[in-house]
Amino acid sequence: MMSRNQGQPQSGYTQLLEGSFLATARAVNIDVHHKHCYHIAKFIRGKTTVQAIDYLERVMRKQDAIPYTRRSRKGKGGNTMAGHRKGKMGPGAYPYKASREFIRLINSAMDNARQRYDTIDPDEMVITHVAAHRGQISRGFRPRARGRATPKNHYQVNLEIFIEHFGEEVEEDEF
């Protein structure tokens, strides 16, 4: 794993591109909350592309929720509590915008796989790596009383995904 400067936005992929049948996609400076992207990435890692897209579409329709495991209780960061959802999930939410961006990213990786490998079905590929890193910060301020000001920053997110096929390559018969 490559090291990165924590104070600066991530440039390029964070993992080495190693794998026999590997396809990648990257989205830069997306206007979505980093917390939502982190939890979606953690949830879809290890699933096939079709399973991930189907689940995220159900999240967009508010039929299934994304489980929230970090920053879901009261604490130093303020009240960021997420309510418990149906089933044995615990805290979770329905992040619409982040789900839409992840569906676009997965479809982009599948298109890249179709371009690169003619004999592999991208629907059967597995998501081996997915990450959400903080992107650019547009700094601003809000004037307050008595000459003070409070920061009003706009945060963006960089997303990356690797999908991989683990089976044997299917040979097509040529006539």
Task: Set out the residue ranges of the language-model regions.
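Ribosome large-subunit tunnel/peptidyl-transferase-proximal elements
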Residues: 2-121, 126, 163, 172-173
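Short, solvent-exposed beta-edge and connector elements
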Residues: 32, 145-146
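Solvent-exposed, flexible loop/coil residues
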Residues: 70-72, 145, 156
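Extended, charged amphipathic interaction segments
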Residues: 120-143
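C-terminal edge-of-domain segments
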Residues: 147-175
